[in-house]
């Protein structure tokens, strides 16, 4: 294997590890909110206050709040790992095929200076490329992790009395077959692909705009010209986190109807067979409001979890990129 191949492999492995770590962290911290969202969405008559009352009535409060944390951490952790790895590969390829004009015109600025004045070391793409890359990467990750998603939702719900993940898996396999592990994938893909695509688009635009609104301190060079100084850890993390929250709020509002239908399909596949018929049934029996059940919970969780995952991931990659550049510089000496 050539040095270039080994370097590419190590970078892909690090993207996978960074995505895994950021996903697990956000999933575990925010599991109580996700649990409440599932309880609210499982039935049109289930309100937030009723869901909280059910959990408070449990013999042990903390285990009740973190019920389903293991499948959630596995799904979100490996989902983030697959997503960030595939997204990076797609964006790197897109950047080589169709680079932004600004990236090729900056001939007098070194690459290290360009990276240091930005809150991110990830490839810079057009809005369309960011949209398509995010959608494609999320669709792939969603398909691979769908069985864990079904197990997580069933385990969190009060409609099933599963005592363990193994018993849940055996029950689904016995009564629904392999198809049961992919219940709701259509609604999930329709929800997640646009969400992820729009998220990457708004996230990148947010970083760009916020970096302009809150620039780094300027420094004076030996030629008496001024330029942006290196962006520090706290400044970059603040911009990335704020951009992530804003993108998460916008995308959660747009995609919540698909999430509400998806949850019903996964919990009651016999009653809600697909996205179209499920949406019609929910609206016909409960009104349009049913499509917005759990919006506040989902919006708060998705905004914070996505922002946290992206901020941690970006910082790990920034540090790794700095190490890789330093190593490459030493090899050239």
Swiss-Prot record:
Belongs to the mitochondrial carrier (TC 2.A.29) family. SLC25A38 subfamily. Mitochondrial glycine transporter that imports glycine into the mitochondrial matrix. Plays an important role in providing glycine for the first enzymatic step in heme biosynthesis, the condensation of glycine with succinyl-CoA to produce 5-aminolevulinate (ALA) in the mitochondrial matrix. Solcar repeats lie at residues 10-93, 125-209, 235-319. It is found in: Mitochondrion inner membrane. One of its GO terms (molecular function) is glycine transmembrane transporter activity. One of its GO terms (biological process) is heme biosynthetic process. SUPFAM superfamilies: Mitochondrial carrier. Keywords: Membrane, Mitochondrion, Mitochondrion inner membrane, Repeat, Transmembrane, Transmembrane helix, Transport. One of its GO terms (cellular component) is mitochondrial inner membrane. The keyword Repeat applies. This is Mitochondrial glycine transporter. Residues 98-126 are annotated as: Disordered. It is a multi-pass membrane protein. It catalyses: glycine(in) = glycine(out).
């Amino acid at each position: 294997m050539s040095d270039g191949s080994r370097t590419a492999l190590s970078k892909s492995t690090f993207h996978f590890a960074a995505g895994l770590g950021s996903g697990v962290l956000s999933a575990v911290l925010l599991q109580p909110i996700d649990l409440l969202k599932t309880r609210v969405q499982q039935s049109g008559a289930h309100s937030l206050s009723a869901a909280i009352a059910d959990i408070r009535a449990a013999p042990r409060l903390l285990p009740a709040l973190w019920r389903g944390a293991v499948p959630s951490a596995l799904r979100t952790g490996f989902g983030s790992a697959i997503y960030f790895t595939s997204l990076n590969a797609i964006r790197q390829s897109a950047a080589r095929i169709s680079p932004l004009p600004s990236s090729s015109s900056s001939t007098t600025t070194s690459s290290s200076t360009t990276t240091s004045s930005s809150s991110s070391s990830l490839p810079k793409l057009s809005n369309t490329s960011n949209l398509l890359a995010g959608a494609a990467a999320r669709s792939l990750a969603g398909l691979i992790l769908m069985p864990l998603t079904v197990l997580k939702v069933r385990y969190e719900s009060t409609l099933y009395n599963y005592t363990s993940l193994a018993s849940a898996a055996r029950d689904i396999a016995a009564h629904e077959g392999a198809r049961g592990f992919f219940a709701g994938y259509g609604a999930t893909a329709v929800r997640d692909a646009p969400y992820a695509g729009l998220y990457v688009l708004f996230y990148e635009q947010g970083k760009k705009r916020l970096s302009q609104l809150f620039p780094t301190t300027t420094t004076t060079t030996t030629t008496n010209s001024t330029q942006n100084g290196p962006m520090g850890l706290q400044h970059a993390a603040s911009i990335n986190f704020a951009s992530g929250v804003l993108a998460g709020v916008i995308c959660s509002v747009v995609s919540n109807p698909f999430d509400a239908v998806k949850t019903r399909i996964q919990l009651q596949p016999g009653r809600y067979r697909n996205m179209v018929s499920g949406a019609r049934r929910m609206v016909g029996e409960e009104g349009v409001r049913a499509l917005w059940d759990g919006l506040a919970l989902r919006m708060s969780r998705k905004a914070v979890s996505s922002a946290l995952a992206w901020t941690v991931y970006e910082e790990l990659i920034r540090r790794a990129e700095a190490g890789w550049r330093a190593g490459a510089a030493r090899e050239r000496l």
